[in-house]
Regions:
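Hydrophobic ligand-binding cavity/cleft-lining segments
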Residues: 1-45, 169-175
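Hydrophobic pocket/interface hotspot
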Residues: 28, 38, 59, 76, ...
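Short beta-edge strand/loop motif at the mouth of beta-sheet-based domains
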Residues: 16-17, 35-71, 82-84, 141-152
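A short, structured loop/turn motif at beta-sheet edges
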Residues: 25-26, 77-82, 99-107
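Glycine-centered tight beta-turn/hairpin loop motif at sheet-sheet or coil-to-beta transitions
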Residues: 12, 67-69, 90-92
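Hydrophobic/aromatic beta-strand elements that line small-molecule binding cavities or substrate pockets
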Residues: 19, 72-78, 94-101
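Residue-level recognition of conserved beta-strand positions in structured domain cores
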Residues: 42, 63, 89, 99, ...
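Terminal "cap-and-tail" regions of soluble proteins that handle hydrophobic small molecules
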Residues: 2-8, 103-175
Length: 175
């Protein structure tokens, strides 16, 4: 069963993932906003201008050079601690994190509004990232299996899916 769903009702498709986390929203907020905590699960470093998640703040996303030589930039679109964080991710994507109290924990909803051909790739990647955030083990070939499942699910609705860039050096390298 796939974890991510595809929403095609907006101006661009979006992949949406939900995860139940055992910690309260204030703790999860720190995990999605504090640089040292992001390093444990996010796919790259996250540097926020001035160190504060405020609307309009610039963000830099340098990837580890051993994975891919690339740096994305972004801008904070919304920040309502500990409920909502949204920002641009490069030139073509918008990430949105919604935190909902659920019992003693939090329901985290991650939406990635993106280019249609990137939906399966990003769904597989975000699922792996959220597994890390939740403290779950990640198998070495999990990304490829998830990508194949999401490609089969998404292609009939939004067309062919692209794997990672050719210059990607990580485990999920393209065929």
């Amino acid at each position: 069963m796939t974890d991510a769903t595809l929403d095609t009702t907006g101006p661009k498709p979006a992949v949406r993932l939900e995860r139940r986390l055992p910690d309260p929203p204030a703790v999860v907020w720190r995990a999605i906003t504090e640089r040292d905590q992001l390093k444990a699960w996010f796919p790259c470093d996250v540097i926020v201008e001035g160190g504060r998640w405020e609307v309009g703040a610039a963000i830099t996303f340098p990837f580890p050079p051993e994975v891919i030589e690339m740096t994305l930039t972004g801008t904070v679109l919304a920040a309502d601690e500990p409920k909502l964080l949204s920002y641009t991710w490069g030139e073509e994507e918008i990430l949105r994190f919604e935190l909902y109290p659920e019992g003693d924990g939090t329901r985290l909803v991650l939406s990635d509004q993106l280019r249609a051909g990137w939906a399966a790739r990003n769904a597989a990647g975000w699922e792996e990232c959220l597994d890390r955030l939740a403290g779950l083990p990640v198998e070495p070939d999990a990304w490829r299996r998830r990508f194949d499942v999401y490609s089969a699910a998404f292609e009939p609705r939004i067309g062919p899916q692209q794997g990672p860039p050719a210059e990607y050096k990580g485990e999920a390298s393209a065929d």
